[in-house]
């Protein structure tokens, strides 16, 4: 932990020494954001909305680039292309460090300050990023597993809809460690209907499964709720999902889902742009990862966000927000 913090601080000092300040720093700044998820997904839409808001407020230019599908090679090419343009800053998600290491390190070597978001909490410093804005995926999974166990779950599914995304692997690993029961990692397609069918089939084959963790609200969380709803009242299956959508918040408020794990994606888009602006204009920046989650959202909080009454109170609806587990100074 200390080594990571020292590495982050050292990288920041080196970049500041190379960049300098003055009139050039006051020119209109241009940043590029490369992520592995598109704005068609509510999670990434919130990130883009936050980044666009920060850019508008700060008077800077922001260009967003995303592969057409989850394609690590294509994403690496986008990072390389962005670095070649020598932007004032690069914001990037890191779903797989091995696949993106060369491109990100190349950007850093070219003198482009890099901030990672969403995926990459545990590897950002080693790749030369100034810091990461997001959450520890392992810790978030562990918090979810522990809470699911408290709610009475004994046998669970962890739905992985994006094979090759190491951050999702870490979520499932944390969930397994926190749950301390039987957990099956179930690979599913990144298509909601296919997810619903896969969950339905698995639940019908194994009547002992009483908990499901989805790693995306829109791709897997909603379909998991639909699959369990179709089982009727004769069986209790607890559902939790990473991230929030209106449908998931309604499901949590109605106690069809136990809780959601919120990592505040708007902040993951907004803060990096503002931090890069501050870096150029004031020469200041965080010296460690910036935590935006995890926060567990239960029925009361979900209803509040929707502006509606929560369902009748039960033990499973009373999920209180939690603080992230400390794994690194300045991080979640």
Language-model segments: what does each one mean?
Residues 27, 179, 267-332:
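Hinge/cleft segment of the Venus flytrap/periplasmic-binding protein
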